[in-house]
Regions:
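Detector for C-terminal structural segments
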Residues: 15-18, 58-85, 284, 347-348, ...
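Ligand/substrate-recognition segments at binding pockets and active sites
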Residues: 28, 35, 42, 103, ...
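Aromatic- and charge-enriched surface segment that lines or borders ligand/interaction sites
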Residues: 38-48, 149-194, 217, 310-315, ...
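N-terminal lobe/hinge region of extracytoplasmic solute-binding protein
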Residues: 86-87, 99-155, 186, 260-262
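Surface-exposed binding/hinge segments that line
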Residues: 94, 163, 198-246
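Gly/Pro-rich hinge or "lid" segments in bacterial periplasmic/extracellular proteins
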Residues: 120, 124, 134-142, 234-294, ...
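Extracellular/periplasmic solute-recognition and catalytic clefts
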Residues: 208, 268-281, 302-366, 386, ...
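Ligand-site clamp/hinge motif
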Residues: 253-254, 282, 286-332, 472-473, ...
Length: 619
């Protein structure tokens, strides 16, 4: 009996001790949670203090004083409209500055020097460093001021005057004034500066005048429908930094990484980036003039050209975004490990660009077989785009009929896609002098030369490789020999500049309203121009010019639809498809949203962030 009582007493004591231990552990967890909250608040306070000190440093340097509340997040109603979405994000409960946004490019970049570079990858980087006078609201698509606080046209519609915000400065602390805007235009119009695309973009501008420190006027040759985009969208270069290259233009033209601006991020060394770095890294601009601080400490792009290596890097959490190809995406959507840490984003951007095959009509001084529109149209009839979309893209794309989106008012609804029709293609080729003469299935011309050409494509794009191989077999059935030619990105760009290729497959980005002057007007066949296929048609030249000079939107759309009809008949490109974006994005990236301009991941001012508790990287 006593022995049983002793065991019972022992168990009671042990139970009481266990209860006390559990209570103590619970208190310790509460203390740890409290300490974590305190540390989080302290980190936020430190970031606010840093923001205040940086603002004070900038204000003292520029002769301004921000006041005692410089460190607090601004209210939405206190900031210019271009910063309101960023201010809304900064006002959310879990918002925090800090961490890095790490992405990957599937190709190396030849240069990130502004206006010398010609690809979307360099433009993505420059977007965080250079700023323009205005930009579009992501939802309404209306223009809103960035560097400019106001603007107005004169009664003639040929003069557009901007008033700059006070206190603007570049990342090196030098003030940004109207003189820098004028310099940017003047610099780009110097013939020795090798920027033919920029000059074509600015062709309608006669002169830019700095009227005073904060007022700049663009004078156009005639009223121009796209005047706001041309003048307001010009990335402003600092005169004090770039003017040296007027005396040594070859150093600018051949440069790899001369990049300095007024944006929220900067290169640590604005002249020191080189392609062999294997990555591009931008740091927060401590002198940024904007009312909302950029959220990330650093933006990093790693160059990872192999798809498998890029996916492995994403799985290892070393990059935050993985753009998947259709076959991968279909497989990875059901990958439990990925679904736990990443969100899927599958969408067709309203301004999605298009892919195409461009048929070069002149090499050197000699016309090619593709100078004959019957040959080009035959090649479009031999290109089964619908099968490409289903078998290569797995349905994650839509047909492109022209440079204009089918949802755009520029599109002519009477036009139908060029159908896959081998019989019609052979008829057109026979009219152009290509027939089977040796009973070997190969088409030859009157001199007995086989219809054979090379199709250049980017070697590291698996989807494009599949498309090229698919088309090789398809064309061969009709007696046309196409040789797929995988090529490095830098070599492709050089081929374009020299216009040295038979055919090439690439893509163009798009916009709210697409001006096709640079791609299809005959004046743009110059070396380095975007009409790198030597397409020349006086009829479309006249229609493009009429559209560009028409400020009445309804009338202008009629001109664009006529231009589309001519392109549809001429087929300077075989228009392929508009692809959906298929992406996995690390779930710690917050405030992602679809807008009228697409996903807001790359918007500037920045709208996305990582809550403090989920941050991985220090400064």
């Amino acid at each position: 009996m006593n022995r049983h009582f002793g065991w019972i007493a022992t168990l009671i004591v042990l139970g009481i001790l266990l209860l006390l231990v559990m209570v103590q552990i619970d208190r310790q967890w509460q203390r740890m949670a409290s300490m974590q909250n305190v540390m989080t608040e302290q980190a936020r306070d430190l970031r606010a203090l840093r923001r205040s000190l940086q603002g004070l440093e900038s204000d003292l340097a520029s002769g301004r004083f921000a006041g005692m509340d410089a460190g607090r997040a601004p209210r939405v109603d206190e900031v210019p409209s271009a910063f309101r979405r960023a201010a809304e994000a900064a006002g959310t409960e879990d918002y925090a500055e800090g961490d890095w946004l790490v992405q990957a490019f599937g190709t190396g970049l030849a240069t990130i020097t502004p206006y010398v570079s010609s690809d979307a990858y360099a433009s993505e980087v420059q977007n965080y460093v250079l700023e323009s006078l205005v930009q579009r609201d992501p939802q309404s698509l209306e223009w809103q001021g960035l560097l400019a606080e106001s603007w107005e046209f004169d009664d003639s519609g040929t003069e557009l005057t901007f008033r700059l915000r006070p206190g603007l400065q570049f990342s090196d602390g030098e003030p940004l004034t109207a003189e820098d805007v004028q310099f940017t235009f003047d610099f780009l119009m110097v013939d020795a500066i090798a920027v033919p695309r920029a000059r074509a973009f600015l062709e309608k501008v006669e002169v830019v005048e700095a009227l005073d420190e904060r007022t700049v006027r663009f004078i156009f040759e005639e009223p121009y429908f796209d005047a706001m985009r041309v003048a307001g969208g010009l990335g402003v270069l600092p005169k004090h930094f770039y003017e040296r290259y007027l005396d040594e233009p070859e150093n600018f033209n051949e440069s790899r990484g001369i990049l300095l601006g007024s944006g929220p991020y900067r290169l640590e060394d604005p002249t020191g980036w080189t392609p062999d770095a294997g990555r591009i890294e931008l740091e927060r601009n401590p002198r940024y003039w904007g009312p909302v601080e950029p959220s990330f400490d650093r933006l990093v792009w790693r160059v990872i050209q192999n798809d498998s290596a890029r996916l492995t890097t994403f799985r290892n959490r070393d990059i935050d975004v993985y753009g998947a190809r259709p076959r991968e995406y279909a497989r990875l959507r059901d990958d439990e490990a990925l679904r736990e840490r990443a969100d899927t984003h599958e969408y067709m951007s309203p301004t999605a660009g298009y892919s195409y095959i461009a048929w070069n009509q002149r090499r050197g001084s000699e016309p090619t077989r593709f100078a004959d529109p019957r040959v080009r149209k035959a090649m479009s009839h031999l290109t089964d785009v619908d099968r490409l979309i289903e078998e290569v893209m797995l349905g994650y794309a839509e047909r492109a009929i022209s440079p204009f989106s089918p949802r755009s008012d520029q599109h002519n609804p009477d036009l139908e896609p060029i159908p896959y029709n081998v019989e019609r293609a052979l008829e057109l080729l026979a009219e152009a002098g290509y027939e089977e003469k040796n009973r070997d299935g190969v088409l030859v011309n009157e001199e007995g030369e086989p219809f054979s050409f090379e199709l250049v494509y980017f070697q590291d794009n698996e989807d494009t490789r599949r498309i090229a191989l698919f088309l090789r077999d398809l064309y061969a059935r009709a007696g046309v020999e196409m040789k797929p030619t995988p090529t490095e990105w830098s070599v492709m760009l050089e081929n374009l500049s020299r216009q040295d290729f038979d055919a090439i497959t690439l893509g163009w980005t798009s916009g709210v309203e697409v001006d096709i002057y640079q791609m299809f007007h005959s004046s743009q066949t110059v070396s380095g121009g975007d009409n790198f296929i030597h397409y020349e048609n006086p009829e479309i030249d006249a229609v493009i010019e009429a559209a560009r000079g028409e400020v009445d939107e309804a009338e202008r759309m009629e001109h664009w639809r006529e231009a589309e009809r001519i392109l549809h008949e001429d087929q300077p490109y075989t228009f392929l498809m508009r692809r959906q974006t298929l992406a996995f994005i690390d779930r710690r990236i917050q405030n992602l949203e679809q807008t009228a301009l697409g996903l807001n991941l790359g918007f500037v001012p920045l709208e996305v962030y990582v809550p403090f508790e989920q941050q991985r990287h220090g400064q």
